[in-house]
């Protein structure tokens, strides 16, 4: 269910992910964001379109497996997260780095 409140839409997208692979995807007009694990593809599409005022063509999601983390003799896990790869329409861009 797509939330109608703009504040709820803004809470779905946590932060942009800037890695080598994500930077290569920028050339194909694809942007990578970390989103809450419960977010669905229509929710992510509505959130990106309302936050950045762009047209989204496609949304792909990835939930990488959790990694083990050891603290002393105790073994725990890193938190679960979800990535969204958002493809924008030609001509639309998102400014991740504001120009100084």
From Swiss-Prot:
GO molecular function, one term: structural constituent of ribosome
Name the record gives this protein: Large ribosomal subunit protein uL23
Biological role: One of the early assembly proteins it binds 23S rRNA. One of the proteins that surrounds the polypeptide exit tunnel on the outside of the ribosome. Forms the main docking site for trigger factor binding to the ribosome.
Pfam family, one: Ribosomal_L23
Keywords: Ribonucleoprotein, Ribosomal protein, RNA-binding, rRNA-binding
Alphabetical list of InterPro entries matching this protein: Nucleotide-bd_a/b_plait_sf, Ribosomal_uL23-like, Ribosomal_uL23/eL15/eS24_sf, Ribosomal_uL23_CS
Subunit architecture: Part of the 50S ribosomal subunit. Contacts protein L29, and trigger factor when it is bound to the ribosome.
Keyword flag Ribosomal protein: yes
GO BP term (any one): translation
Record-stated family: Belongs to the universal ribosomal protein uL23 family.
One cellular component (GO) term of this entry: ribonucleoprotein complex
Gene name of the record: rplW
Domain of life, per lineage: Bacteria
